[in-house]
Amino acid sequence: MEKNLTTGSVFKNVVLFSLPYLLSYFLQTLYGMADLFIIGRFEGVASTTAVSIGSQVMHMLTVMIVGLSMGTTVSVGQAVGAGERKQAAHNIGNTVILFLVVSIALTAILLSLVHPIVVAISTPADAVSGTVTYLTICFIGIPFITSYNIISSIFRGLGDSKSPMCFIATACAANIALDYLFMGVLHLGPAGAALGTTLSQAISVVVSLTVILKRRSIVLKKSDFKLCRAVMGKILGIGIPIAFQDGLIQVAFIIITIIANQRGLNDAAAVGIVEKVISFLFLVPSSMLSTVSALGAQNIGAGKPERAIQTLRYAVMLAAGFGVLASIAIQFTAEGIVSLFTDPSTADGAAVVRFGGQYLRGYIFDCIFAGIHFSFSGFFCACRKSGLSFLHNIFAIVLMRVPGVYVTSKLFPATLLPMGLATAAGSLLSVVICLIAFGVIRRKSTLVLVEE
């Protein structure tokens, strides 16, 4: 389970570590897209909109949990890189206690806020009932979502990106089968989509716990579960800025969804579908962020900052290169991709395809810029300077992404293309800020050398 990533070819380590990560993200996105694809075949636009809006809320919650767990990945990775196995075990034990409390609190709070949340995001009237049902069931499953993500973060901190891939593969297969059962056979609509998602996560957690019991690379003692202020400080010091950053990014996209919702049901469905497609295309940037965090943390822990910088360079090259290719391809295939998620033979479906194609053609350029600033964010996390990642994203959201989308929505009511371009412009601003921050860090020679 544990793997040393501080020796050998940096490029090879990046590729070999990121591929399972990439496949994990692919599978996770696939089962999220499966909900929309399957419900689009068996239900109408209202149900599709309910699932797309509800899944955006759940995606926001999930990425915040993943962001918080980044503190575990980096803390465990630095301990492993430094050869401190006892410290790694202590970090893991404190993580378990922390996220146990977080999952219970989130479940209780969000279940009491289902209706206010649905109202706050301006859900179209026809989709309100389905969205409430979807979110209620998914909120009940928060402990499973939390458990899966902290287990995966621990494995990745230990240098193992393959096991989490197997866990999510199990969840993906279960979700697709359950979706067809609940929506195709039993016709449960949004409730069926939520049940499939929740139960598949539970199955994945059972599988991951079974693997942990069989492997004993890191042995946990009772004392490891005793809360330690220093350990919690490290985990939360890295995780909280990333969690808030990811949460605010999702808030920005929910605001964009609200803006789209106010334009009508077809625009709302189009934006919801494109968000799912973009989440699929963002697999490479996302995997590079996590790869740079994990590899960078181990190398910084081992006192090899130059290898962390090399990791960043290769990640930027791979992610930005992918973004360029994806941007070119989407210009020729946008409507065809959107049509997979709705019935273009109906009047509403044809409108969704048209609007979705417009939005996707503009939005896709975000793949290039996100590939760059995601990689830098991973590097900043590895250096335990996750506050920089938080700041560049906040500036991009407040100064460019949300204002840009709002203005273009008002100026161009007949098309979604300018809204897509405005979203990409936010990431371009992030890239500029990241380059400036990285230059300052290099000049001041403060890379790494994080306090013990």
Predicted regions and their residues:
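Short runs within selected transmembrane alpha-helices of multi-pass transporters and secretion channels
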Residues: 69, 137-156, 164-172, 193-206, ...
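Generic alpha-helical transmembrane segments of integral inner-membrane proteins
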Residues: 22, 26, 30, 34, ...
